[in-house]
């Protein structure tokens, strides 16, 4: 027997009706490739910016400064002997 005869093997074409091994469906809500399945796409919501509110900026700034000042005073009181 020659070398090429020993390495020859038969390849069987898979059946057209067989869909392969069973795989469980993805979890509910998991995105799939099927565009028809699932919820329709959400409509875009248009938002309107009201601009910059100077009062809100000053309130935030003053609150941050109070926090920094308080932490600075508290830390100096705690570290002094």
UniProtKB/Swiss-Prot annotation:
Residue ranges, compositional bias (Polar residues): 1-22
Location(s) in or outside the cell: Cell membrane
Origin: domain of life: Eukaryota
Disruption phenotype: Late flowering and defective in UV-C light acceleration of flowering. Strong reduction of FLOWERING LOCUS T (FT) expression. Hypersensitivity to abscisic acid (ABA) and alterations in polar lipid contents and their corresponding fatty acids; reduced levels of phosphatidylinositol (PI) and of 18:0, but increased levels of 18:2 and 18:3 polar lipids. Increased susceptibility to the hemi-biotrophic oomycete pathogen Phytophthora brassicae but enhanced resistance to the necrotrophic fungal pathogen Botrytis cinerea.
Any Gene Ontology CC annotation: plasma membrane
Record's note on what induces expression: Rapidly up-regulated after pathogen exposure (e.g. avirulent and virulent Pseudomonas syringae pv. tomato) in a salicylic acid (SA) defense-signaling pathway-dependent manner. Circadian-regulation with accumulation during the light period, peaks of expression at the end of the day, and low levels during the dark period. Up-regulated by UV-C light through a SA-dependent process and in a CONSTANS- (CO) dependent manner.
Keyword field: Abscisic acid signaling pathway, Cell membrane, Lipid metabolism, Membrane, Plant defense, Transmembrane, Transmembrane helix
A UniProt-annotated Pfam family: CYSTM
TM regions (residue ranges): 56-74
GO biological process: abscisic acid-activated signaling pathway; cellular response to UV-C; circadian rhythm; defense response; lipid homeostasis; lipid metabolic process; positive regulation of defense response to oomycetes; positive regulation of phosphatidylinositol biosynthetic process
Tissue expression remark: Expressed at very low levels in seedlings and petioles, and at higher levels in leaves. Also present in phloem sap.
Primary localisation category: membrane
Disordered: annotated segments: 1-34
Membrane topology: Single-pass membrane protein
Function: Modulates resistance against pathogens including oomycetes (e.g. Hyaloperonospora parasitica and Phytophthora brassicae) and fungi (e.g. Phytophthora brassicae). Controls the abscisic acid-mediated (ABA) signaling pathways. Regulator of the flowering time in response to stress (e.g. UV-C). Regulates polar lipid content; promotes phosphatidylinositol (PI) and 18:0 but prevents 18:2 and 18:3 polar lipids accumulation.
Family of this protein: Belongs to the CYSTM1 family.
Record's protein name: Cysteine-rich and transmembrane domain-containing protein PCC1
Gene name tied to this protein: PCC1
């Amino acid at each position: 027997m020659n070398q090429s005869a020993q390495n020859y093997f038969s390849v069987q074409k898979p059946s057209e009706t067989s869909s392969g091994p069973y795989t469980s469906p993805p979890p509910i809500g998991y995105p799939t490739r099927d565009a028809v399945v699932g919820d329709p796409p959400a409509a875009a919501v248009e938002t309107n910016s009201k601009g910059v509110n100077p009062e809100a900026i000053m309130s935030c700034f003053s609150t941050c400064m109070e926090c920094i000042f308080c932490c600075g005073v508290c830390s100096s009181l705690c570290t002094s002997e």
